[in-house]
C-alpha cells in the first residue's frame, strides 16, 4: 500500500499544498477538499492540524510578507453576493435571448449552449442554477420542450426573487440562497433544535455530475410523519461517509436546514432502531397528492423534488404509455429516465401496490416498493 496523499488548502489566501505528483496547482485533491467544504460540510470536523500541516504553516509564516486590510467575513460575504448578482444579471440576458429565439431554435444549437451558460454561473458562485442548466444539457433527444420550458421558467422565477430578496422573509431568503448554492454552516444548523423520532430509510437516489458523485437519502419519521432529506457528496471513487441501507431504521435527532418548508437535514448521531417501524400512510389519490405539493410550493417554490408515499396504485400501460393508475382512474407518467416499469408490474401482479417516489410536479420517480418482505428497491 502506498503512502497516503497529504493535501491542505488555506482558504484565506487560496494556497494549495499537496504531496501528489501533479504539476498543476490546484490539483484534484485540493479541489476535492474545497468541494467537500462547500457541499458537504457535515463530513468535515474541527481539530488541531497534523504535524505536517503545522510545518507547512511555519514555513509560510517565515516567508510571508505582512498582509494588511484583510477583509472581514461580512465584507467577503458582500463580495460574493455582488459576484452572484452579476451572474444573475447575465443569466437573465441569456434567458431573454432564448425567449426571443424560441426553444426549438435554442435546442438546434446543441447542449453546449447550456453547458457554457452553466460554466459562467459556476464562476459566479451560483452552482444551484448551474446544475439546472447542466441537467438541461444532459436531457439529450428524450428531452421535451415542456421540460426545458419549465426549467427555464424556474430559473427566471429565481432571477425575479433574487432582485427582490430584501423583501423576502428570513426563511424565504435562506431558501433562496440555498437554491443559489450558498450552504449554511453545519455548526449553525446543529445549534438549532433537533427533531427526535424513529426514522425509516424510504428511498435512495445516486447520481453524478462530472467527477462529483451525490446521494439523496429520504427518511420518514414514525411519530412526526415528516420526511427528512440527507444529501451527501463524494469525489471520484471515494465512498460516502455513512451507509444508509434501504428499509433500515434509526433513532435520533435530525436538524433541518433553515427554511419555510425545510427538507434537507443533518443526522449527526443515528442509532440503529432495532424495532419494527409503524405508521406508513400514503396517498390513494393523485389529486390529493398534487394539492399538497402545490401547498408546499407556496412555502418554498425551489423544491427540486417532493417525497410521496402512494397506496393502492397500479402500474399499467395506457395508450402505449407506461403510467401509474390511482383509485380514481387518474394516471401519472413515470420519470423519463425510469427503467424499472416491468419490475413494478411483476411485483404488483396487476393488482394495487404501495410505493415511495419523488414527484417533480409532472412525473414520478419510484425509489422503493412495499412487498410482503418489506421495502425493496423500486
Task: Give short role names for the model-derived ranges.
Residues 121-166, 183-186, 192-198, 203-205, ...:
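Long, compositionally biased intrinsically disordered terminal regions
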Residues 1-11, 193-200:
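Hydrophobic, aromatic-enriched, well-ordered structural segments
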Residues 3-60:
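Short Cys/His-based metal-binding microdomains
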Residues 1, 208-213:
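A short catalytic or substrate-binding loop motif that flags glycine-/basic-rich loops and adjacent residues
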Residues 60-180:
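Extended alpha-helical scaffolds
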Residues 219:
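Conserved SAM-binding loop
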